[in-house]
């Protein structure tokens, strides 16, 4: 018997990796399938799946499912990976992607074979007042920022060993009913910050587009930095401009094509 296969493209933006799949191949249970294919031992392995569907008002509609199967509003890096895929397929320099957080426009700034760089118009952020969260052993203060998805930005002097456990505790704190993405930020100077990410539905990631945006916006809002901000992550550098709207600039690389057996 010939197995049923689901074609995919794998892409990465600063080490934040995604599987891109045409919605025509979508199974009935997107949550379970996304969890299965993202598994790094028994699946292909990725931080999430971008499912692509037709859109009347954009080049494509992208539904993002995290590695744990939960659906999220948007990934800045995932959106850039989708743009790279469409750019390679259609030879376009401007890609519009309808996400759960609205339409995002990705403008190609450079390309070398399957390596792309885009600047993405991410929309206007919402910045809240800094507040504290009580954890099991201490209290932390952070700045809430919405980039179309929720973030809590915490400033630290250094990334202490085991920071992931504390970030996970923040992310599931009862103050955040639906969970939250957590960023730990070290200010390097007025235009450079270093960030670690713990994403809702994924865990630690090497980079995050919306997380980079949230970290830069929070740093500017609290007068610790000024636009543009270079965000240094374990996966590379992204640049954030905040001019009412946030503009996120960074790379995306198409890694491979493949087929996943059902």
Q: PLM ranges: what are they?
A:
Residues 126-128, 133-138, 143-147, 246-262:
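C-terminal domain-closing interface element
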Residues 1-114, 153-262:
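A glycine-rich beta-to-alpha transition motif near the start of alpha/beta enzyme domains, typified by
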Residues 149-151:
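Internal alpha/beta core interface subdomains
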Residues 114-122:
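Short, solvent-exposed secondary-structure boundary/capping segments
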